[in-house]
Amino acid sequence: MNTETQQKPQKAQKKKSSPLVTAICILVIVCNLVYIFFSQQIHDFVGGRFYQPTSEMEGIIENVGFTWRSDYIMRSTKPELEQADIFNDHCVDDEDVNSALGCYSSADNRIYIYDVKGKELDGVKEAVLMHEVLHAIYDRLSDGRKEALNSDLKNYYEDHKDVFGDYMDAYSEEQYYTELHSIIGQRVYDNDLSDSLKNHYAKYFKNHDATVEFYKKYTAVLNAEEEKIEKAKDALDAMHGILENKRNTYRSNLDSYNKQVDYHNRQTELGNWSQSRYDYLVAQGKRIDEERDALNAYIDEYNVEVEKYNALLEEERQLFGKLDSRFETTTEKTESDNKT
């Protein structure tokens, strides 16, 4: 008798995922989230690692004293010192009446600094680097952080308009707050800042006051030059006033003397000779000659001071020209034209 053995159906077994695969999936998700939320920081960190500054630029960076927060941002912008012609291509707008010392391009995340020459302007490159890095920092802030910061910046500016004058009038609404963020950070000591602004800048500079000192140092040289010009101009104006008084007095005395001579000559022709009148006119003529000589000597003295003043103006022109990349290229072209 044949019998059939009935087998029970087998249940399908669920495949268990490997712990390694699970870990990899989680890691991929985490990496994606990290990149989404920190892509700018990652980009800055990676980009900055390949930056190789010149020895001069490295010294400038060290002098400024960036904190770790700002250092990797700064290095990601690859700051570069440039000669006038190259710098003008990167940073100078032909329609802009103001000179530029540096610029930050958010489009390609680069900072360019004009290679200012002259030991008397020590500190200018540090001040410019600080200013431009502050632009890069502001560019990376969230909208919420910018809104709070803008309020603090605006309050400070409104309370200190006399310090800044009409500086901010040249900036569009789009550029306004990033520029305000840079100039306040570049120019204002901590004890003049609100606590919130002081804490903000402290995140990016190891010693904010020491960094501000670079701006104060080179602008003090410019201010001293302007004060010297102003004092020389005041002295020259005073001399000019004295000269005009002397000249008017001499002309009046000369006119009076000539009239007396004419009168004496007419009287002599009429037979009314007077020895006393003649002696008086001779003495008066000597005084007129002495007055003329004194006037001419004062004119010579005045002209010497005019030459000194003009030399100061040229000195000022050359000094401020060192801060204008267009001045250098114009000077070079003029010198070249003179040689042909």
Sequence positions of predicted segments:
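N-terminal Lys/Arg-rich, disordered targeting/topogenic segments
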Residues: 1-17
